[in-house]
From Swiss-Prot:
Binding-site positions, Mg(2+): S78, T98
Leading EC class: hydrolase
Lineage: Eukaryota, Metazoa, Chordata, Craniata, Vertebrata
Stretch list, region Required for interaction with STK16: 2-16
Domain OBG-type G: residue ranges: 65-290
General function of this protein: Catalyzes the conversion of GTP to GDP through hydrolysis of the gamma-phosphate bond in GTP. Binds to microtubules and promotes microtubule polymerization and bundling. GTPase activity is not necessary for these microtubule-related functions.
GO CC, any one term: cytoplasm
Catalytic activity from the UniProt record: GTP + H2O = GDP + phosphate + H(+)
Protein name according to UniProt: Developmentally-regulated GTP-binding protein 1
Family that this chain belongs to: Belongs to the TRAFAC class OBG-HflX-like GTPase superfamily. OBG GTPase family.
Cofactor field: Mg(2+); K(+)
The EC number(s) this enzyme carries: 3.6.5.-
Length: 367
């Protein structure tokens, strides 16, 4: 472990010394690829034994979505969780109170959302300091990350946490790079770009792939990509998670300062202690989770509007709905009757591939 950390420090120092220009792009690409490989060794150490990377921290996934609270010790994560979910996470006025993951559940708009108060991150978590590695391993399984910041401490904290999460392959508020990557048996590296590239050229791409011992592949760049984008695609273990920055303790700043904070993208100012602005926070959480609620209607009865079946927006076909209810339901599926915004007529007869929209009502007709 210490050998890997030393090599990471050497490469980071060399990258800091190297000026960024066209002439050094090849060399920097090579260094970035080496760095990514070493980081991967830290995330998944070689050799068996011991628990997984999130040992002792992970909590069984329940509900329709999972949110992780990440932040430095004593920024108010536990207070926020206890006031949001009514869970009493041990709150104290000294740093490092929460030493294991504390789960809570909040019900909002019919959805059951699991909240995880993850232990405070210290700088250097991605290098295995503190219990940061386990914390970040749990953060990778979340549908949304809330980075809780103390409004009085500068946004330097924000940068440190982002770097820690980035080092563990978590990309915040980003889409996966639009890069096609396909390994093949022969034919060398074949690079095609559908738009002008400011950073990547043939030599840089080859140097990065050579570091991964890939000498035959088809690469298609569909956007102006960076060396980091290409490395993310080759590594293939990146997770893309939406993120909200929660600025806590706004009771200690002026109205003018609050106006400035409101203009920062992905930010919600709150006071966990006074429960100020929780409505705004919950509304933003709902927007970022992009959940779809489907109501059920048993034959000959009124729809049940009390407990919707909640689906992620990427899987909202009638088939996904059936699978969520019971894995065998799809085998008995004949057709479905749907009322709501996804159909032209109410009700409309649809097949298993029909894509449902938020607050649709569905009745399944079995064979």
């Amino acid at each position: 472990m210490s050998g890997t950390l030393a090599r990471i420090a050497e490469i980071e120092a060399e990258m800091a010394r190297t000026q960024k220009n066209k002439a050094t792009a090849y060399h920097l690409g090579l260094l970035k690829a080496r760095l990514a490989k070493l980081r991967r060794e830290l995330i998944t150490p070689k050799g068996g034994g011991g628990g997984g990377p999130g040992e002792g921290f992970d909590v069984a996934k329940t509900g329709d979505a999972r949110i992780g609270f990440v932040g430095f010790p004593s920024v108010g994560k536990s207070t926020l969780l206890s006031n949001l979910a009514g869970v009493y996470s041990e709150v104290a006025a000294y740093e490092f109170t929460t030493l294991t993951t504390v789960p809570g559940v909040v019900r909002y708009k019919g959805a059951k959302i699991q909240l995880l108060d993850l232990p405070g991150i210290i700088e250097g978590a991605k290098d295995g300091k503190g219990r940061g590695r386990q914390v970040i391993a749990v953060a990778r399984t979340c549908n949304l990350i809330l980075i809780v910041l103390d409004v009085l401490k500068p946004l330097g904290h924000k940068k440190i946490i982002e770097n820690e999460l980035e080092g563990f392959g978590i990309r915040l508020n980003k889409q996966p790079p639009n890069i096609g990557f396909k390994k093949k048996d022969k034919g060398g590296i074949n690079l095609t770009a559908t738009c002008a590239q400011s950073e990547l050229d043939n030599d840089t791409v080859k140097s990065i792939l050579a570091e991964y011992k890939i000498h035959n592949a088809d690469i298609t760049l569909r956007s102006d990509a960076t060396a980091d984008d290409l490395i993310d695609v080759v590594e293939g273990n990146r997770v893309y998670i939406p993120c909200i920055y929660v600025l806590n303790k706004i009771d200690q700043i002026s109205i003018e300062e609050l106006d400035i904070i409101y203009k920062v993208p992905h930010c919600v100012p709150i006071s966990a202690h006074h429960r100020w602005n929780f409505d705004d926070l919950l509304e933003k959480i709902w927007d970022y989770l992009q959940l779809v609620r489907i109501y059920t209607k048993p034959k000959g009865q009124l729809p049940d509007y009390t407990s919707p079946v909640v689906l992620p927006c990427s899987h909202t076909a009638a088939e996904d709905f059936c699978t969520k209810i019971h894995k065998n339901l799809i085998k008995e599926f004949k057709y479905a009757l749907v009322w709501g915004s996804s159909v032209k007529h109410n009700p409309q007869k649809v097949g298993k591939d029909h894509v449902l929209e938020d607050e649709d009502v569905i009745q399944i007709v079995k064979k």
